[in-house]
């Protein structure tokens, strides 16, 4: 799960990836997401949370796992009184790359360029 904390001036304050691992139980993964999001909100004074909306996934079990982690992130924000805004994958791609049908590689490249992220 990737995350970024941005200021309104498009400055990256923090970013990273939470590696959940295959050996952890679903409960442990969900708790890890909740704990990370809560800590990031508190540490950086987050005022709003933006998330990509669901996308169709061929594997129902993977979709269920994604749902749990999204719910954990939303709950962490809600318990801190932080509003959560959801955006469609097409809207996210359009905002980042300027084209709603951009590939994952194009989105990743643009994010690396914009926020000086490592390859």
Regions found by a protein language model. Name each.
Residues 1-119:
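Phosphate- and other anionic-substrate recognition elements at nucleic-acid/protein interfaces
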């Amino acid at each position: 799960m990737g995350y970024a904390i941005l200021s309104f001036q498009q400055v990256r304050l923090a970013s990273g990836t939470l590696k959940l691992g295959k050996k952890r139980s679903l409960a442990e993964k969900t708790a890890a997401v909740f704990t990370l999001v809560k800590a990031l909100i508190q540490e950086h004074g987050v005022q709003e949370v933006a998330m990509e909306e669901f996308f169709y996934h061929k594997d129902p079990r993977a979709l269920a796992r994604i749902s749990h982690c999204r719910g954990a992130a939303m709950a962490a924000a809600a318990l801190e009184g932080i509003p959560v805004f959801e955006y469609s994958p097409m809207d996210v791609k359009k905002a980042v790359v300027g084209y709603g049908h951009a590939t994952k590689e194009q989105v990743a490249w643009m994010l690396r360029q914009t926020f000086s992220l490592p390859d």
